[in-house]
Amino acid sequence: MLLKEASITESLNSINPGEYAKVGQILSRGSMRRRLLDIGLTPGTMVECVGKSPAGDPKAFLIRGAVIAIRSEDCADILINQY
């Protein structure tokens, strides 16, 4: 698989099922930041959007071999480089 790094930083909300991104920065604070770090969502981590609920929120992401659902409001605080 060939990946081309985008130069624009967006939020994790911007990727759709089948798209990849690399985590750039996590803006969340407190317990939410700790939860995201605990599930392996750290800067530099590759993430794939693998699905979304019928309503569009939450989306499911493949993170370090585990599928994790993240709400849109939390995705907005995760900045990424899309591939």
What are these regions (language model features)?
Residues 1-83:
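Compact, glycine-rich, soluble single-domain proteins
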